[in-house]
Amino acid sequence: MRPTAIHAVVAATAAAMMLTGCASDKPPVCDSLDAVRHSADELRNANISENGMSVVTSDLSQLKADLAQFANDAKTQFQPQADGLRSTVDQLQSSVEMAKAAPTAASLGAVRTAVTAVGDAARDLRDAVAGTC
């Protein structure tokens, strides 16, 4: 094989490897964001009237775990948005505890409002990370 042909083969192979690497290499923060989004969606879609508060409690625990992993992966890069989501999750936790203690229309309404706030904060986080993922 001539040197020019060898260089062409090497260049083509290197280019293919780089393109393959670009397609599959995404930062860990992207995977943890996907987990946060999935957990937030599960929480938003929880049917309290059908499944009770236990489904919200379970979904909330998963979201907290996913958010902790996201914060670990993101370090300080998306801290304001992660803190905003964490704050709304804490508010939801309080609303859930109050609704468990006194399941009234008002306390269940507060849970629904808090779930909506969590969804909004999750969207803010997703929008902030969009350029990275």
Where are these regions (language model features)?
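Surface-exposed, polar/charged faces of alpha-helical domains
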Residues: 27, 31, 38, 42-120, ...
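Residues in flexible loops and secondary-structure boundaries
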Residues: 9, 14, 37-38, 51
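Bacterial signal peptide processing site
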Residues: 22-25
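Sec-dependent bacterial lipoprotein signal peptides
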Residues: 1-20
